[in-house]
């Protein structure tokens, strides 16, 4: 049996920027073990698997390590795959996932993800994570992810992590996002996951489920532009809605191949 694997860069219109995700269309679900092995073989942060139903798509996400409950950039990549490679003409792509119903709108090459809002609350950081940070945060919040607040974009860009200490903690599907006001945008961030194959994520849609409501309350605005200042980097168009958030960005297909199982 062969499967088709699309490599798609999300939150970028350049193959050297954004966050690469693999997208695998299926007729029926493979076993979780098979999908995890495919994700390991793909060697990118996330692989999305989808099945077309009558008027929606079932969607699951795997890192090389575990199945995730939500992945924004791989959802955006999947929407792009469906529109560009499966002649899908509806303006709204509907997904069903472990995080419930997710809708993506496609307008003029920009994909807007409708995602659940995760308002972070004040918290304390595990000591190993705190000690692993080269620059200490001024405050700590938590939702699914730990959200660390800093004073400047320079601090976010200069931050380094002692992985020996950082990897002493397992956050399951969660991670650590560091954030500050941006110099030429509303806010910036970076995202790290302990004990993961990839320490830093290039662009993370799901972390903005927490970042958007936080910065909306700080900046007193509901429409914002964010940059994830990883090595590859990416731009996100952010909207804070009443109960959910919207994250928008571009995508491009880099390659496609067949994989034998």
Task: Identify the role of each PLM range.
Residues 1-70, 76-261:
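Active-site proximal loop and beta-alpha junction motif in alpha/beta enzyme cores
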């Amino acid at each position: 049996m062969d499967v088709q694997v699309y490599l798609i860069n999300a939150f970028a219109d350049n193959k050297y920027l954004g966050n690469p995700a693999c997208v695998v269309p299926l007729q029926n679900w493979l076993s979780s073990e098979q999908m995890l092995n495919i994700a390991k073989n793909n060697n990118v942060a996330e692989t999305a698997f989808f099945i077309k139903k009558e008027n929606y798509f079932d969607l699951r996400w795997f890192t090389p390590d575990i199945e995730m409950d939500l992945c924004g950039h791989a959802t955006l990549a999947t929407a792009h795959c469906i529109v560009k490679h499966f002649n899908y003409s509806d303006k709204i792509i509907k997904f069903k996932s472990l995080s419930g119903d997710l809708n993506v709108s496609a307008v003029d090459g920009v994909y807007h993800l409708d995602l659940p809002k995760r308002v972070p609350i004040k918290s304390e950081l595990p000591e190993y994570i705190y000690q692993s940070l080269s620059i200490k945060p001024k405050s700590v919040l938590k939702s699914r992810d730990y959200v660390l607040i800093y004073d400047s974009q320079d601090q976010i860009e200069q931050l380094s992590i002692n992985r020996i200490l950082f990897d002493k903690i397992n956050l399951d599907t969660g991670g650590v996002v560091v954030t500050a006001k941006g110099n030429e945008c509303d806010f910036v961030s970076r995202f790290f996951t302990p004990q993961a194959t990839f320490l830093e994520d290039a662009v993370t849609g799901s972390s903005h489920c927490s970042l958007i409501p936080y910065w909306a309350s700080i900046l007193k605005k509901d429409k914002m532009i964010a940059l994830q200042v990883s090595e590859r980097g990416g731009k996100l168009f952010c909207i804070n809605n009443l109960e959910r958030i919207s994250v928008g960005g571009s995508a491009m297909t880099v390659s496609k191949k067949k994989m034998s199982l």
